[in-house]
Amino acid sequence: MDGRQLYRVADVMHLLSMSRSVIYEQIRSGRLRSVKQGRTRLIPASAITDYITLLEQEARKL
């Protein structure tokens, strides 16, 4: 990540190699935290890190 604190959904799509619909699905399910600023959905850098950690933990359980 490039030092920003908040990322747009389009940026997170590229960072995580996921589609827009999957990103929003993860947000709805509570697995990926986000905030809303006006009409824009933003994802904190810490939420991205937490989500990656969650994926790694789930992968270890398999």
Where are these regions (language model features)?
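Polyanion-binding surface elements
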Residues: 1-22, 53-54
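Major-groove DNA-recognition helix of helix-turn-helix-type DNA-binding domains
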Residues: 16-42
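A short, Lys/Arg-enriched interface patch at domain edges and termini
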Residues: 48-62
